[in-house]
Amino acid sequence: MPEIHPTAVVHPAAEIADDVKIGPFCVVGEHVKLGPGCVLHSHVVIDGPSSFGSGNEFFPFSVIGLKSQDLKYKGEPTYLEVGDNNVFRENATINRATDIGGATRIGNNNLFLVSCHAGHDCQIGNHVIFSGFATAAGHVTVGDYAILAGCCAVHQFVSIGEHAMVGAMARVSQDVLPYTIVEGHPAVTRSVNSIGMQRRGFSEEDLKAVRMCYKKLFVNKKLTVHEALEELRHSGYAENACLRRIIQFVETSERGFCH
C-alpha cells in the first residue's frame, strides 16, 4: 500500500503505485497517475489529467499538472506526461497543455530546480536541467542534455537544441543551435559548448565538426546562412552526425536562430 500521510488529500480515483510515498499536506487530484517509487515531500500539489513514470521526486511547494496559464484555454481536456526519475525542486511549476487533446511532455532524468517554470505544451527531452528561476513559455522544445541557467527566459515556440546551454539571465527569443552556448539580453550565440560535449563523450572529430559549423555560421560574416550550409555540406565533415544535425536544425527552424 502507498505510504500516505494523514494530512495529505489524495482523490480516491487517483492511480497510486503501491510503493509511492506522499508526505504531509500534499494534494493529489482525481486524474493523476503516479508510478512506482515516486516520492512527494510535504506541500506538493499535483493535478491532472497527468501521468508520471517511476522514481519521480517532488519537493515542497512544487505545483505540477495544473491547467494552462494561456488565456485561450477554456477548460478543454489536456494532459501532462512525465517519464521516469525526474526531480522537481521547491516551487517548480509545470502546466498542462492548452489545445484540446494536447500534452506537455517531459522525458526522463530531468532536474527542475527552485522556482523554475515550464509552460503549457512544452516538449522537454531527457537529462535536461532547468536551473533556479529558469522559465520556458508555452510550446518551447528543449533537447536532451540542454541546460537552462538561472533566471533565463525562453520565448514561446523557441526550440533549444540538444547539448546546448542558455546562460544565466538570458532573454531567448530565437532558436538555440545544438551544441552551442547562448547568453545575453537578447541572447546571442557565444561559442561551442565544448566542455559539455567532452563531458558527454563526444569525439574530437565531433568537436572539430561543430567548431567548423560555428565558424561558418557565426564568425564568417561574408557568408549568408544558405551559403554557409552549402559549404558545410561539401566539407570534410559532411558525414559527421553532429554537423548533419546542425544543418537539419537550421533548415527546420521557424523562428530563426540566435546569432
UniProtKB/Swiss-Prot annotation:
* Job of this protein: Involved in the biosynthesis of lipid A, a phosphorylated glycolipid that anchors the lipopolysaccharide to the outer membrane of the cell.
Organism of derivation: Akkermansia muciniphila (strain ATCC BAA-835 / DSM 22959 / JCM 33894 / BCRC 81048 / CCUG 64013 / CIP 107961 / Muc)
Matching HAMAP family: LpxA
Highest taxon of source: Bacteria
**Where is this protein found?**
Cytoplasm
Q: What is its main location?
A: cytoplasm
Molecular functions per Gene Ontology = acyl-[acyl-carrier-protein]-UDP-N-acetylglucosamine O-acyltransferase activity
What is the protein's given name?
A: Acyl-[acyl-carrier-protein]--UDP-N-acetylglucosamine O-acyltransferase
Identify the SUPFAM superfamilies for this entry: Trimeric LpxA-like enzymes (SSF51161)
Quote a single Gene Ontology cellular component term.
Answer: cytoplasm
